[in-house]
């Protein structure tokens, strides 16, 4: 009885591995959830709304300091593949200062990047997050299950 039992366990384990030999991913990029066809356009449209919102307010807020040319790069979220719950979202930015060295004539550049984590509530479903960010002013919308916005998260980051 024991040899059959262990053979069954080996067969079950083999069946749980994808055919290409890789283990199934626990987390996936939100752009490809639930499938690339279903997630890609929707997520990129939300990202474009966020970038427009940032560009609209940058001159009066974040872009008043040393890094007056801040640019939003990418907004990315990781999603638990089995449940659709967001694990984390990060929005990346870049900015620079360029000055002339008066003694040497060289251009001195201080270029930086920032990775700003979104202040999400635990276990936020991706579908609810995207629906929230598709409405009105995405940058100022309260994130699901919180009383904070992406703008609030940027205040502590940039």
Predicted feature locations:
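Sec-dependent signal peptide recognition
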Residues: 2-10
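Cleavable N-terminal signal peptides
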Residues: 10-11, 21
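N-terminal signal peptide c-region/cleavage motif recognized by signal peptidases
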Residues: 16-18
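N-terminal secretory signal peptides
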Residues: 21-88
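Intrinsic-disorder-associated interaction segments
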Residues: 32-39, 43, 47, 119-122, ...
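Short N-proximal segments of mature Sec-exported proteins
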Residues: 71-101, 106-114
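Flexible, solvent-exposed short loops/turns enriched in glycine
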Residues: 100, 106-135
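C-terminal partner/receptor-binding element of secreted or periplasmic proteins
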Residues: 121-158
């Amino acid at each position: 009885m024991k040899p059959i039992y262990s053979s069954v366990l080996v067969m079950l384990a083999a069946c749980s591995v994808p055919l290409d030999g890789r283990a199934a991913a626990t987390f996936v990029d939100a752009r490809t959830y639930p499938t690339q066809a279903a997630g890609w356009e929707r997520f990129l449209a939300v990202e474009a709304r966020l970038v427009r919102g940032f560009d609209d307010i940058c001159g009066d807020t974040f872009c008043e300091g040393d890094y007056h040319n801040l640019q939003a790069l990418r907004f990315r979220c990781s999603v638990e593949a089995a449940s659709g719950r967001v694990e984390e979202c990060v929005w990346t930015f870049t900015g620079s200062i360029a000055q002339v060295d008066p003694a040497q004539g060289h251009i001195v550049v201080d270029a930086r990047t920032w990775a700003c984590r979104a202040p999400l509530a635990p276990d936020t479903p991706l579908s609810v997050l995207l629906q929230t960010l598709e409405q009105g002013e995405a940058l100022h919308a309260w994130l699901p299950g919180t009383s904070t916005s992406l703008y609030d998260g940027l205040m502590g980051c940039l």
